[in-house]
C-alpha cells in the first residue's frame, strides 16, 4: 500500500520582473528534499509537486502571459523554491500574411 500524504498548497508569490523581462515565482516548500521536487512548465502554466515528510505540496498556476519554459531556471534554498522564466515575445511565432490587391493598386505617396 502506498504512503498517503495530505496535499497542501504552498505559500506562493508570483510577479513580473519587468526590468529583466522575466516571471519570478517563489514557492515556500520547507522540508521537501530537492530530489523529490517536480516542476513542469508550459507556456501558460506551472505545475509543482513536492513530497515532504507526511505532506505533499501541490500547485498549479495559470499564467496570464506566455513564457519560454525551455529557458526556465530554478533554485531551491532554505525551503524556498525560486523559479525564473523569461516572458515570450507575443509576436515571436507570428506569421506574415501577404496582402493582394483586389482592384486597382493604390500607389504610395
Label for each model-derived stretch:
Residues 1-109:
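Alpha-crystallin/small heat shock protein
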Amino acid at each position: 500500500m502506498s504512503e498517503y500524504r495530505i496535499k497542501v498548497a504552498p505559500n506562493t508569490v508570483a510577479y513580473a520582473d519587468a526590468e529583466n523581462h522575466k516571471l519570478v515565482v517563489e514557492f515556500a516548500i520547507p522540508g521537501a528534499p530537492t530530489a523529490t521536487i517536480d516542476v513542469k512548465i508550459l507556456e501558460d502554466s506551472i505545475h509543482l509537486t513536492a513530497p515532504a515528510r507526511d505532506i505533499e505540496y501541490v500547485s498549479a498556476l495559470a499564467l496570464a502571459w506566455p513564457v519560454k519554459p525551455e529557458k526556465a531556471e530554478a533554485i531551491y534554498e532554505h525551503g524556498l523554491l525560486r523559479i525564473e522564466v523569461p516572458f515570450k515575445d507575443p509576436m515571436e511565432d507570428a506569421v506574415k500574411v501577404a496582402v493582394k490587391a483586389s482592384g486597382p493598386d493604390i500607389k504610395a505617396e
